[in-house]
């Protein structure tokens, strides 16, 4: 039985255009890469899956982008209000030691769940994060605390590297020993990361961003392909070993 909690909102801050940073009281622990299913209120019947940014000391933090009616309603909530949360759900990242530096690489909303992962990984961690433009760059200070190195890329060149996060990944792999790569973001980015790491024999895990319905495996909204078969991301994922994800 999945755990449901009525949680008190502590913060719901607008940190960039359309992006909010929420913290709530939460009684459970979570693993990096897991997510929660949030009932946003109003007449929205389905919950919204949101990746966990941090979870420690009885506090759950998630950063989310307003993309529809549900998250729009969520963005209007204020401290002191209750929010109905199901979770934590899904399978998280493998945080075991690998010889060489760890690289966490994210694009867009795929950046947010990597903060807790970067905090928990052993050894040196390099973070590579991609955004559309400078005004959407978030969590840079947070990552600078838990990563020994951080790199930012923007699509339009208004901040950091002008280009793809995978450009930076290739440079890192060519200049030093990379032990493991952990990625979350859009499918084209994940596909490129899978190809690059496979070519160099580097351990890689990918977190799939799929639209979800129930979040507990009862529907088939979040299916993806793994070794030619349909699998439910909410049950088998959202984190997969790269070789297990057909992208």
Annotate each predicted stretch with a short phrase:
Residues 238-247:
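Short microdomains enriched in Cys/His and/or Lys/Arg
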Residues 72-209:
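FNR/FR-type flavoprotein reductase catalytic core
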Residues 11, 54, 152-154, 206, ...:
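Structural signal for conserved beta-strand scaffold positions within catalytic alpha/beta enzyme cores
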Residues 44-52, 90-97, 234:
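Short, Lys/Arg- and Gly-enriched loop/turn segments at beta-strand edges
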